Amino acid sequence: MKVMKFGGTSVGTPERMKSVAAMVSESGEQVFIVLSAMSGTTNSLVEISNYLYKKNSDGANDVINNLERKYMGHVEELYSTDEYKQRTKEFLASEFNYLRSFTKDLFTSFEEKNIVAQGEIMSTNMVANYLEEQGVKVCLLSALDFMRTDKNAEPDSQYIKEKLGAILKENEGYQIYITQGFICRNAYGEVDNLLRGGSDFTASLIGAALPAEEIQIWTDIDGMHNNDPRVVGNTEAIRQLNFEEAAELAYFGAKILHPTCVQPAKFAGIPVRLKNTLDPKAEGTIIDNVLLKGKIKAVAAKDNITAIKIKSSRMLFATGFLRKVFEIFECYQTPIDMITTSEVGVSMSIDNTTHLNEIVDELKKYGTVTVDSDMCIVCVVGDLDWSNLGFETLVLDAMKNIPVRMISYGGSNYNISFLIRESDKARALQNLSDVLFYKK
């Protein structure tokens, strides 16, 4: 069995839903489909929640009514028979009435999670009904029945495997199974989610639990590219990536794949394939455990980075200095992207500036602090083990005319990263492409 995940844009219109349905049914294979909410729906549900936090029931009801009209229009386009139009409209009406029920009560984060969950519940029901109307044997499963996190908000993989296995045993003989993308229950049985973007994670967790033959992530892009096509004109799709390479690219800016997605698949040894709904026959990108020795695969960039430098003579020959610095970032739950040290200073980069002022105030206890905003991280990804001679020369040659604030290498064998000004990003990405991939 293959797991196929389709994001919000892939099911964003009735026509897109029909295309996805045709794709999964015409293959003749037994597949497990993971669907996100229709594009724009989650934003609307979050908007409803924001109104309810402010006790603005009228504002919430306006958004609910507009969203309901939109969905009822989709029903008319999607189905060809009155029976399935009526069935789906009745289901959607009950969903929107459920959303309206929240406008009358106390509103907390618990209610917000219930509201946000409804987008995927609606999209999966619509696609399942359409497939059934087309005569396909389809089984709609609620992710709330088998997706669960533990007390640390981490996926409970053993529970997922056992519960999903039992559910599938009770529902044998279907060609297609469908479930929701990021909703789950927490350790206390409450409706929760794997955070936005977690539908990739869900697909990977389900694939590992089955175990699947392959996990496919479908978007409207032809796999991962060797550079950012929005910035660099001459990019190419990457045909193969190692799991570690894919994780680096996902973290450093490749929006096509969520960074957490590859971990369950990697540990289960299940390949992940990135495919394009607009060009289903395209090869896409395969992610597996194969590592091509000495091969540089791609360049990526992460924007909105802030650099922080602490300079202190007290750091010289001192022990425990870095621990104190790290404890400040931990206290404010702010992850560090890059770090470099010298005898009397340490430089770090962060992408979450929510508590920047508090962090800087705390750091000033230990030395002089300087902050640089509007920075970005450019990283080169591939098999960059230190024993592979020559890649450093190529990379540094490409960056020779770009002012570099920090360089990080050695924490991973799969990337070398540069912190530069955002204004220099386009030039850096183009230079790296020219030197690394086109030998200019």
Describe every region a protein language model picked out:
Residues 283-440:
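A conserved regulatory-domain signal marking ACT and ACT-like small-molecule sensing domains
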Residues 1-2, 30-33, 72, 114, ...:
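Structural motif
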